[in-house]
Amino acid sequence: MNKAISDLSAHTPMMQQYWKLKNQHLDQLMFYRMGDFYEIFYEDAKKAAKLLDITLTARGQSAGQSIPMCGIPYHAAEGYLAKLVKLGESVVICEQIGDPATSKGPVDRQVVRIITPGTISDEALLDERRDNLIAAVLGDERLFGLAVLDITSGNFSVLEIKGWENLLAELERINPVELLIPDDWPPGLPAEKRRGSRRRAPWDFERDSAHKSLCQQFATQDLKGFGCENLTLAIGAAGCLLSYAKETQRTALPHLRSLRHERLDDTVILDAASRRNLELDTNLSGGRDNTLQSVMDRCQTAMGTRLLTRWLNRPLRDLTILQARQTSITCFLERYRFENLQPQLKEIGDIERILARIGLRNARPRDLARLRDALSALPELQQAMSDLDAPHLQQLAQTAGTYPELADLLQRAIIDNPPAVIRDGGVLKTGYDAELDDLQSLSENAGQFLIDLEAREKARTGLGNLKVGYNRVHGYFIELPSKQAEQAPADYIRRQTLKGAERFITPELKEFEDKALSAKSRALAREKMLYETLLEDLIGHLAPLQDTAAALAELDVLSNLAERALNLDLNCPRFVAEPCMRIEQGRHPVVEQVLSTPFVANDLALDDSTRMLVITGPNMGGKSTYMRQTALIVLLAHIGSFVPAASCELSLVDRIFTRIGSSDDLAGGRSTFMVEMSETANILHNATDKSLVLMDEVGRGTSTFDGLSLAWAAAECLAQLRAYTLFATHYFELTVLPESEPLVTNVHLNATEHNERIVFLHRVLPGPASQSYGLAVAQLAGVPGKVISRAKEHLQRLETTSLPHEQPRAKPGKPAVPQQSDMFASLPHPVLDELSKVKVDDMTPRQALDLLYTLQTRL
């Protein structure tokens, strides 16, 4: 990090100017505009050269030291900025605001923008499929206020959360690229371990000033209308976010129009482990392939894709909203109405982010061209929605509206294919502004004007040797030979005498000169002014346009879900008041798409008589798939989607927990078993009788008896909590749980052996599995034949020699648990092995006694 320079007297004037600006932004890289380059100096240069793989050099001296520096062309800055932002860096853009031709000393410069990962809005720097969120948090270990802002859409929300565990789960859900925390928090707190965490001064979170700035932003007297007047901590966090956004953008933020109060009680909560295990929008390898999002997303717009991602990561418990979405999807499916709408939606584009850039006053010409095309497409879109009779769809159609005046304005203003930036002009159409047309005509047609003027003057004066010309010193002129100079008309004003010639100027030529010499720069300046005026006109319509964008995004998602329902054979789930979860012919929506063979659908039935299924069966038999598909079906139902099942009847759930798969946490110093136990503890502490719990192979990673005991106790606890539980295990001993826990039922995934090879049937059947087929799976995996053979020998010996071990005691008042052989017990003791080989009939009494003494010493 750079250190502040207090004594600037020894530095050159240029470096004094640089350090005055840099001292205010020591922890950020500074791009310092000098001519056609952004120059980067000192420690910033060393860091940028390494990150961007550009040459580090040194040029000149200041304060007796050479200046490390590197630079990038200003017209290529976008690519470099994108790379830095992806690396989590923030960049201060310092531009020349003075005129080099008139400046005495260094040209005036000022910071015009600060680009940070959470406040970028440039299309080239953003992932169009993901929200780009920045969050701020305030509070203590008991209660936290969290504010979340997407500056690229204007979405601004607050909520209050109890405890670190819930806060971290919510941060995992929203996954902000920046997280602002108070500077007076002690170091090392869990939130600070997230990438992108930044400390801000405590007064940025001060409640009263935050309340005042938020009211000013939304032009309200208080925040009661947003339902968050009493959320002291959340308001403080929101004020910090607003301050940070203004600081980085250096402009007003008219697209931030409201504050939404979110409540965790309105949602189905998924913790970090559950999101990871269910692979909602990111697979276990960190990619996007073979995720629920990849299967369910055929949205026509990027803003629709982002909204669908939000829905998948925030399933709802509001039955009114869910049923409105179901009705909308049903309406779209009638007569395949979605097919009429989707091509129209494709013409809309990502107007949500375009409108945000307009609000930030950094929209580019191509943004306005896309907005023009979108507004022009709205009438046809409205026509396509005219026969939609679902109330929610009618409301969305009404909100979308049309904007013929704005469409006409942009149609008149912006050329068909504008350049990427306004910098060099050429954006506005001929005919949009008469003065601009005149200036551009002067600039582009100066040569023709001079030819025409020369012809007119020759005709007027009768002087055939008259010439019209130009030089840089004297400008435009009319030249006559000295012999004809006396015949010059009275309106000719002598400008220059040459050997053998005289040069004149006329009022008409002088007027043209004044216009022509500055026409190009004046045309560019006027075009930029007109462009900024156009942006201001659009900002005046920002509120209804943003409402339109939100309505179109939701229409896109709902029509997409209708298309998915048709093409993936999804059916509408039915929510009921009775506590239950009944699925007929359920399928895993992702696995089904990647299989080359038909997917084997399975049923599930949980209700007041059965709250837990103990699932046994071979590895690769489909236990994990069966559990995951249940969770995904329940989750899809809670976003209002149709589900991959012949039928589904369920009550609302409050949480979805998963304890599936194995992974360690090396950075946190936690083993695989420790991670597993932490996830199990979280489930046991937070599950309720409305939660869906998936537990897969609990107890692995420790000794057989420890693991079995933990799994047994965890299963008993969940059964007593009455959570909807799928409990997959290889501990066959757990199949006796139904005898002591009446809400528990056994099911198994079946398989068979054919020609000594295992065949997985993937069918869920009642009762426990008959065997585990572990050796057959190992053989299928390619374990060497000699190892398989030796394993069979050990298995046979274990099955014939292992003694029953003591089972966990039954609870008081419950029947005793039948004893079973432990197929996982350790190998027999060598003494027992030797005893089994003794031929007793061939020994004398003395030999037998001696052998007993010998064996006794080995015990």
UniProtKB/Swiss-Prot annotation:
InterPro entries given in the database record: DNA_mismatch_repair_MutS (IPR005748), DNA_mismatch_repair_MutS-lik_N (IPR007695), DNA_mismatch_repair_MutS/MSH (IPR017261), DNA_mismatch_repair_MutS_C (IPR000432), DNA_mismatch_repair_MutS_clamp (IPR007861), DNA_mismatch_repair_MutS_core (IPR007696), DNA_mismatch_repair_MutS_N (IPR016151), DNA_mismatch_repair_MutS_sf (IPR036187)
Positions of ATP binding: G617, P618, N619, M620, G621, G622, K623, S624
Database matches in Pfam families: MutS_I (PF01624), MutS_II (PF05188), MutS_III (PF05192), MutS_IV (PF05190), MutS_V (PF00488)
Keyword Iron: no
SMART domains documented for this protein: MUTSac (SM00534), MUTSd (SM00533)
The entry's keywords: ATP-binding, DNA damage, DNA repair, DNA-binding, Nucleotide-binding
Segments for region (Disordered): 799-821
GO molecular function: ATP binding; ATP-dependent DNA damage sensor activity; damaged DNA binding; mismatched DNA binding
Function: This protein is involved in the repair of mismatches in DNA. It is possible that it carries out the mismatch recognition step. This protein has a weak ATPase activity.
Family: Belongs to the DNA mismatch repair MutS family.
UniProt-recorded name of the protein: DNA mismatch repair protein MutS
Gene this chain is encoded by: mutS
